[in-house]
Amino acid sequence: MNRRILCVDDEEAILKALRLHVRKVFEMSTANSGSEGLEVFEKKGPFSVVTAEMRMPGMDEATFLAKVKELDLCVSTVLLTVDADFEFGGATALQTGKMFSILTKPCPPVRFKKTIEDGIEAYHAAKTKA
């Protein structure tokens, strides 16, 4: 079973903290920008779950996650944000199925792991149907 995840965030400290919490459970790759994330996705994929910080320099998270979905329709995408409100369209993305989940930072490790587990299950269910 593919338990590979890609986490994209411009804050190295966030990526290190995520890796610390999931290293025994998931195989995690990281990137510091949307363009780097796409490169990692194409070269090291497939990934079951891709997480992205909402406000990244360069390519925004919506563009990045849309491009990831173009490459693999089954991948579960998770948005990480410090914004508790969803004025940026996050609720709509969830409702239309374009986004698997939205997590606010700081996110408790247990919640992050559970969301990733659920995303992996959704990925494999989608792959089975495809």
Model-predicted segments: where are they?
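Conserved acidic segment of CheY-like receiver
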Residues: 2-13, 18-19, 50
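Two-component/phosphorelay signaling modules centered on CheY-like receiver
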Residues: 12-30, 97
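Helix N-cap/capping motif at the beta->alpha junctions
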Residues: 30-39, 61
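Receiver (REC) domain active-site loop signature in two-component systems and cognate sites
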Residues: 56
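Hydrophobic/aromatic residues positioned on beta-strands within the core alpha/beta folds
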Residues: 80-82
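C-terminal output helix
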Residues: 104-116, 120
